[in-house]
Regions:
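Cysteine-nucleophile protease catalytic domains, especially the papain-like/related folds used
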Residues: 1-49
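Active-site-adjacent substructure of cysteine-protease-like catalytic cores
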Residues: 34, 38-100
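Short linear sequence elements within intrinsically disordered, low-complexity coil regions
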Residues: 15, 45, 115-116, 173, ...
Length: 188
């Protein structure tokens, strides 16, 4: 079994062009999703969502939806010192998420999504967390094997609408134009 795990870890590292150093390793989230699709048969409807565009309730609703669908979440965040990628694989009745930090079981457990602060970070975790992995949070959603019955949900932000008229009468038609519409998700 150890040999099979080693071979899988090697294949994963090669697939994402992993950079290694004595202090840790790393790859970009977009590369990870591409590799899962291209080399490991995962569904092409995966998407990356940035937490910047959602309030806490909306974000937790998305997390719970993914986990309720039996899909683990590849999650990223940064402290003042370093960034880290880890897995969310559950939640409890108090809205704490279960985190597998990827450090051989060290510090795995339930955390508030707003703080995500392990007590003693593992390799690559930095010497002082500086408040946890609370910056630049995002997640890859829709992570599942390829199947024909999947769909992808895009999330959009609308920050400005313009009307064709400045005043309106009841039952009168007018045009609304979306001036600034942003796609807050990306597919791979």
């Amino acid at each position: 079994q150890g040999k099979a795990v080693a071979e899988l870890m090697y294949a994963c590292g090669v697939a994402v062009d992993m950079e290694y150093s004595p202090d840790g390793s790393g790859a970009y989230s977009g590369i990870v999703a591409d590799a899962l699709i291209q080399y490991f048969g995962y569904n092409k409807n995966m998407g990356y969502v940035s937490r910047n565009y959602f309030n806490t309730q909306e974000w937790m609703d998305m997390v719970k939806k993914e986990l309720n669908e039996k899909r683990p979440i590849l999650y990223n965040g940064a402290s003042k010192e370093v960034g880290h990628e880890f897995v969310l694989d559950g939640y409890d009745k108090n809205n704490l998420v279960h985190v597998n930090w990827g450090w051989g079981g060290m510090n795995n457990g339930y955390f508030e999504i707003a703080s995500l602060e392990p007590t003693s970070p593992g390799i690559g975790g930095g010497s002082s967390m500086g408040g946890g992995y609370i910056f630049d949070q995002g997640m890859i959603i829709g992570m599942q094997p390829e199947s024909e019955s999947t769909s992808y949900t895009s999330y959009f932000s609308l920050s400005e609408l313009k009307a064709s008229k400045s005043s309106f009468n009841q039952n009168e038609s007018y045009d609304l134009t979306a001036v600034q519409l942003s796609n807050m998700t990306s597919t791979f």
